[in-house]
């Protein structure tokens, strides 16, 4: 567990420590820490030979800026890359002014830097709570796609009505005498073409309804189903926002809190650098930081951003936080909540038809209940969850592009999910199949991001971002894992040897050979 201790301690201290480095590069009075140095801290924690920022230094005071801006070179030819710097020469001067060789060196000076204590941890097991890791999602499962309040209330009533109607049809059919049943069947055979025409008309209306409610996303170019109006859905988002504020009213950080300032700076920088993305400038983005150990973050469709401090304690650096917030912003810009709610309502409507049919044709209530359960599970695992995973993958792709345009080190995006996967395995959690979850597995997300990183790096180049320097954080993470496993193996061998040495050894009394010979000869 020493690795998690080192990882989280370094995350909590270096996360705020790096914000200080982002703001003081022109002053030349801050000791620079490169990406290699930072990851060496984690390795040193693993082998308990800390050479730099370690656990013993966890209670030092570290400054945190009120805001920061990433460096962007001015380029009038590329309107897609909004800029926030004076010129590329500033960045070159900064590289000469400080030994900071990581991509964080492209920062502008800040003012009014508040001072906050970096939190230290008393026990390594407290760094990544087991419950929080297993339930971690960057978007809450239920709240990512809020349904209309009226339909949420009527949904159980609709199912109950479908069951009553289906069961009533079955009872009516069972109560009919045999001769009337034959007459009814004969009537159906005579009017089979009328019945076929009626069903075909219903199916045609359904298809027309579906295609007339398709909209093409201006960001991805993908067609999506939107049944609810935007204004209607925004009103529902306001209702959900009020519910969240009521729940977290006692846990909200103030706007002067350093963690709030940090999150606000990251979000505003991402928004500023992606003003050309359709929909971003139309949303009023408001940040809320919740003081909670849960590792979570989500954005409501109306631009209300909720970030939990547990997530801030879990990210290694500003790059990981920028990607995660970019992922959540992508959810809002792509209108995933409205899209998911529309699909759910459409499937629920079809489900009511199947539910009525199941209760009508099943001869017993027990079989009808079994059929209803099978139908709900098929809908959940064949449509709901796969579609949710598809939306998550799309948000990862667009969020990575948003982070790339903000000159973030996009290589750190996959490292976060590798850390989460390793933490789960370290806690002994069973690896559940991905099809059981609404989100892709941590390992699959990391692999998906690794495939997208080359394209994101090209986006950084087109936006004239400074080139990334220093070692690849993915390579450093693998090195950390290797050192951790070797250290764990060495510690295990030492523990076994100590236990063996501690076992009581019975001293056998040595019998002289002459005594044995004398006994055998009988002398």
Swiss-Prot record:
Transit peptide, start-end: 1-45
Compartments, record wording: Mitochondrion inner membrane
PTM characteristics: Autocatalytically cleaved in response to mitochondrial depolarization both at the N-terminus and C-terminus to generate the short active form (S-OMA1). Autocatalytic processing at the C-terminus takes place at residues 447-456. The S-OMA1 form is unstable. OMA1 pre-processing by AFG3L2 may participate in maturation before OMA1 autocatalytic cleavage. Degraded by YMEL1 in response to membrane depolarization. Protein turnover is regulated by prohibitin (PHB and PHB2), which promotes degradation of OMA1 in a cardiolipin-binding manner. May form a redox-dependent disulfide bond. Exists in a semi-oxidized state and is activated by prolonged hypoxia.
Keyword Transmembrane helix among UniProt keywords: yes
Record's bilayer topology term: Single-pass membrane protein
GO cellular component: mitochondrial inner membrane; mitochondrial intermembrane space; mitochondrial membrane
Active site: 328
Residue span of region Stress-sensor region: 165-195
Annotated domain remarks: The stress-sensor region regulates proteolysis and activation.
Family: Belongs to the peptidase M48 family.
Protein's name according to its UniProt entry: Metalloendopeptidase OMA1, mitochondrial
Annotated organism of origin: Bos taurus (Bovine)
Gene: OMA1
């Amino acid at each position: 567990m020493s690795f998690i201790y080192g990882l989280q301690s370094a995350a909590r201290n270096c996360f705020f420590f790096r914000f200080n480095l982002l703001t003081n590069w022109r002053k030349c009075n801050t000791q620079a820490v490169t990406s290699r140095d930072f990851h060496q801290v984690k390795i040193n924690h693993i082998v308990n030979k800390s050479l730099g920022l370690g656990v013993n230094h966890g209670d030092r005071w570290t400054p945190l800026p009120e805001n920061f801006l990433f460096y962007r070179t001015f380029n009038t030819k590329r309107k897609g890359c909004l800029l926030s710097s004076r010129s590329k020469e500033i960045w070159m001067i900064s590289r000469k002014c400080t030994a900071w060789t990581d991509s964080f060196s492209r920062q502008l000076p800040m003012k009014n830097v508040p001072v906050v204590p970096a939190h230290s941890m008393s026990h390594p097991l407290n760094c990544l709570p087991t419950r929080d890791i297993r339930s971690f999602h960057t978007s809450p499962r239920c709240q990512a796609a809020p349904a209309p309040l009226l339909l949420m209330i009527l949904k159980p009533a609709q199912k109950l009505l479908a069951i009553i109607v289906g069961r009533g049809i079955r009872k009516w059919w069972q109560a009919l005498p045999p001769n009337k049943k034959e007459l009814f069947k004969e009537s159906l055979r005579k009017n089979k073409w009328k019945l076929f025409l009626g069903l075909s008309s219903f199916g045609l209306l359904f298809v027309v309804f579906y295609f007339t409610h398709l909209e093409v996303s201006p960001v991805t170019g993908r067609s999506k189903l939107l049944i609810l109006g935007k204004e209607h859905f925004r009103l529902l988002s306001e209702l959900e926002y009020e519910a969240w504020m009521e729940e977290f009213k006692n846990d909200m950080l103030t706007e002067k809190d350093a963690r709030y300032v940090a999150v606000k700076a990251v979000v505003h920088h991402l928004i500023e650098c992606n003003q050309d993305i359709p929909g971003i400038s139309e949303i009023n983005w408001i940040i809320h930081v919740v003081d909670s150990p849960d590792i979570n973050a989500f954005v409501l469709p109306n631009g209300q951003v909720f970030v939990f401090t547990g997530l801030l304690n879990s990210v290694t650096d500003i790059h990981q936080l920028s990607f995660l917030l970019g992922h959540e912003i992508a959810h809002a810009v792509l209108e995933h909540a409205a899209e998911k709610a529309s699909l759910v309502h459409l499937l629920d409507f079809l489900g009511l038809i199947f539910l009525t049919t199941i209760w009508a044709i099943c001869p017993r209530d027990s079989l009808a209940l079994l059929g209803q359960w099978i139908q709900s599970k098929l809908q959940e695992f064949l449509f709901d969850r796969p579609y949710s995973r598809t939306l998550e993958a799309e948000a990862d792709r667009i969020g990575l592009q948003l982070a790339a345009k903000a000159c973030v080190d996009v290589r750190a995006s996959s490292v976060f999910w590798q850390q989460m996967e390793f933490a789960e395995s370290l806690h002994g959690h069973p690896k559940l199949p991905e099809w059981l979850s609404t989100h892709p597995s941590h390992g699959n997300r990391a692999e998906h991001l690794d495939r997208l990183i080359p394209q994101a790096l090209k986006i950084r180049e087109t936006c004239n971002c400074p080139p990334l320097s220093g070692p690849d954080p993915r390579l450093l993470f693998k090195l950390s894992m290797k050192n951790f496993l070797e250290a764990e193996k060495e510690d295990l061998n030492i523990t076994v040897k100590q236990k063996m040495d501690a076992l009581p050894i019975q001293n056998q009394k040595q019998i002289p050979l002459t005594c044995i010979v004398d006994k055998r000869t009988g002398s």
